[in-house]
């Protein structure tokens, strides 16, 4: 007897419907075809025990199972449930009436309970696209999958419950999530606030510009100057996620298994801060079973790299292409996977190995050669991709001792949102362009072209600072953002002057300047 059930295979953000074909004939062999990985091949033992604990017997027959399409790799334990249901159907223990109506996904424990899986949200989106009536998932994944409307999502705890449901012996209510209500109710702001930061007004200004235009930024300063403190408060001034951004971000975290318990939607912009010992695979993604890396988990949010020179140099260099293209293609011998990674790159570093080069209160013990070698750990091509390079000095005691708090994040956020609204209106006809940092060269020429005086200033800066063509474009993008913050239609001379001032690390005399 031949029976078919349906499930899905996840490869990056791409999901393919998989047909599980189960045939029972005389014999005692178990054959599983269709390019399943080790977890899929091991499913026989889990299914056998789960059936026994659920009150069924594993068929004494020749069982042949095919996972179609057979040339597509299937990975993970989410195939346990459709395989078990298919075996029960082929053995006559469960009627096939509803098999064509539902997609099944879930891992089976030996006692028949269903364990959560990765990628429930993109699987639900695929199930709706394929016009399935419903999706049966482990209970822990139900709210995540129920974000997809026009699809009945049933969260089940055990295999026995699934059998009772598809046999019409027991009724279950589908999980219902009001997506918009849930999204806006949980869209809370960051608990940290720039009002807590005393002084450092120039750095706050740089961070405001970065947030307004989606620019990458690096802060250079001695220990204790507030680099990490200010970076961690950046989410408090970023514009809120849109619903479409939230769905896209949630899909990535779903695939990585990073969604919290009973979380249906990510409503805050991600803030990822990997340790400097991170590997290339953990940073950009990949592995034996392809998983999104930190750059994709930071999609639509912030990737913060503290103590940037302490990262492995080859690890940092793999950031160059994703920073430019805003997506990453992971190619291996057996697969190729694409992940989006449009994020703000924020970094911090000390100015020298001892950390106190240019500090007015501490003596630096590093030689000019040591300082330059330390700075050279960050390659020129990577620095070129960082729009804003900001120097930080320690806050004087008179500023620390002030009782008055700094400007609250809410005020800064209002200005950032207004600037983003200007950009959204400007780029509404350009697909995939939402902020100034994403402008193409043609768009820079159209929207950020300076006048003759501005061109003369840029020429002088290019010659004195030995700036690259990429740095030239970055300056114009930042100047456009400064103009948007001021509500100016055109890029003016003082906008360019401020933008040029944010290219501190392009100067070749860093180790001889003696100050920050």
Task: Report residues per predicted region.
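Walker A/P-loop
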Residues: 219-260, 325
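Basic, amphipathic alpha-helical bundle interface domains used for macromolecular binding and assembly
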Residues: 39-44, 59, 66-76, 289-290, ...
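Walker B catalytic acidic pair
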Residues: 300, 306-307, 318
């Amino acid at each position: 007897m031949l029976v078919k059930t349906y499930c899905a295979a996840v490869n990056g953000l791409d999901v393919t419907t998989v047909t599980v074909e189960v045939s029972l004939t005389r014999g005692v062999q178990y054959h599983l075809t269709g390019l399943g990985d080790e977890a899929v091949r091991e499913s026989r033992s889990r299914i056998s025990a789960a059936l026994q604990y659920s009150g069924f017997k594993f068929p004494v027959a020749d069982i042949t199972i095919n996972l179609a399409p057979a040339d597509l790799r299937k990975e993970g334990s989410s195939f346990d449930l459709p395989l078990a249901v298919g075996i029960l159907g082929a053995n006559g223990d469960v009627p096939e009436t509803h098999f064509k109506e539902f997609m099944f996904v879930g891992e089976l424990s030996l006692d028949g309970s269903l364990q959560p899986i990765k990628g429930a949200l993109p699987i639900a989106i695929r199930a709706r696209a394929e016009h399935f009536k419903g999706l049966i998932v482990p209970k822990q994944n139900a709210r995540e999958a129920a974000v997809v409307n026009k699809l009945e999502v049933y969260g089940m705890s055990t295999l026995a419950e699934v059998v009772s449901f598809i046999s019409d012996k027991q009724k279950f209510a589908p999980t219902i999530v009001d997506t918009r209500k849930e999204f806006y109710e949980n869209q809370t702001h960051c608990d940290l606030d720039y009002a807590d930061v005393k002084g450092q007004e120039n750095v706050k200004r740089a961070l405001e510009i970065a947030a307004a235009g989606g620019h990458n930024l690096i802060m250079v300063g001695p220990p204790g100057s507030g680099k990490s403190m200010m970076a961690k408060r950046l989410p408090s001034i970023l514009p809120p996620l849109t619903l479409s951004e939230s769905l896209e971000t949630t899909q990535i975290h779903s695939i990585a298994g990073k969604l919290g318990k009973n979380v249906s939607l990510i409503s805050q912009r991600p803030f990822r801060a990997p340790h400097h010992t991170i590997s290339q695979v953990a940073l950009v993604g990949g592995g034996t079973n392809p998983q999104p890396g930190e750059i994709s988990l930071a999609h639509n949010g912030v990737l913060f790299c503290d103590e940037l020179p302490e990262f492995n140099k080859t690890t940092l260099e793999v950031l160059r292409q994703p920073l430019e293209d805003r997506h990453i293609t992971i190619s291996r011998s057996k697969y190729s996977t694409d992940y989006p990674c449009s994020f703000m790159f924020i970094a911090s570093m000390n100015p020298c190995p001892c950390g106190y080069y240019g500090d007015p209160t501490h003596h630096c013990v590093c030689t000019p050669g040591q300082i330059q070698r330390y700075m050279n750990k960050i390659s020129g091509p990577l620095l070129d991709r960082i729009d804003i390079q900001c120097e930080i000095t320690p806050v004087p005691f008179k500023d620390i001792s002030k009782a008055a708090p700094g400007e609250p994040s809410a005020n800064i956020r209002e200005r950032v949102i207004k600037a983003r609204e200007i950009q959204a209106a400007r780029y509404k006809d350009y697909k995939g362009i939402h902020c100034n940092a994403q402008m193409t060269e043609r768009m820079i020429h159209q929207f950020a072209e300076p006048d003759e005086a501005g061109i003369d200033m840029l020429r002088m800066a290019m010659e004195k600072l030995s700036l690259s063509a990429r740095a030239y474009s970055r300056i114009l993008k930042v100047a456009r953002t400064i103009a948007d913050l001021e509500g100016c239609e055109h890029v003016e001379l003082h906008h360019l002057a401020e933008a040029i001032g944010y290219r501190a690390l392009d100067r070749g005399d860093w180790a001889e300047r003696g100050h920050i």
